Amino acid sequence: MKKLLLAVAFTAMLASLAAAQQIIDPRVADLVQAGKIRVGVHSIMYTNDPQTGELRAASTGIILLDIARTLGARIGVEVLPVGHPTIPEMLTCLAVGACDMGFMGPDRSRGGVDFSPPILQLDYTFLVPAGSSIQHVADADRLGIRIAVVRDHASTLTLSRIFKHAQMVYAATPEPTFELLRTEQADAFASIRAVLLGYAPKLPGSRVLEDITTGPIFSAWRCRRVKLRG
């Protein structure tokens, strides 16, 4: 429900952008002139369809491209997804002007972009191996526990704010992050539930925890572009 309410609120903000399109809202004038919005998407949330090559969501609850397409439809421009394997690559895309917007968690170190208000809450949890004593997310915040995480991902930012004792073990993308767990270099793998459910069959006896922690997702815009604040 929280995801839906945030998405509805964000869509309402998009509607305000379209209200004055006859005189072209200055916040989107450059997008209208270009005729397109280039949207950076993180590969942990979207993957390439092996048959069509198109980007598709990792789960039905991920609606970031749908939000971008709503904006595109409101202002009458094409939406062009641009996939990035890592968040730093997406930030570079925004910084050099190769992307117009992207979606990511907030972080003070992410200069060079403007953030909207939060538009979604995503659910994060852990994949743990067979025989693990970790039954709940809070159980993992102990000295000596190693949590495999994707560097700079929103789930990693969320955990780093709330966990005080566990050690984060970083990898660049989900596949090597899972390998840290599979090769016993980590005690848990933290990510979006849908991603973890995809990896669980590759590690016999593993399980995805039932409880969750949540974190916000924001739209990030190239500086001096629209900030979507009403």
Please name every model-derived segment.
Residues 21-105, 111, 170:
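Extracytoplasmic small-molecule ligand-binding "clamshell" domains
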Residues 28, 54-59, 111-120, 207-211, ...:
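A structural signal for short loop-to-beta-strand junctions that line the ligand-binding cleft
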Residues 43, 120-131, 176, 193-230:
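Periplasmic-binding protein-like
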Residues 49-55, 65-78, 117, 121, ...:
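Ligand-binding cleft/hinge of the Venus flytrap
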Residues 67, 94-95, 140, 180-182, ...:
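Hydrophobic residues within well-ordered alpha-helices
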Residues 77-92, 134-135, 169-179, 183, ...:
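Short helix-initiation/N-cap motifs at beta->coil->alpha
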Residues 88, 103-114, 158-161, 182-215:
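A ligand-binding cleft/hinge motif common to bilobed small-molecule-binding domains
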Residues 117, 128-146:
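Flexible hinge/capping segments at coil-to-helix
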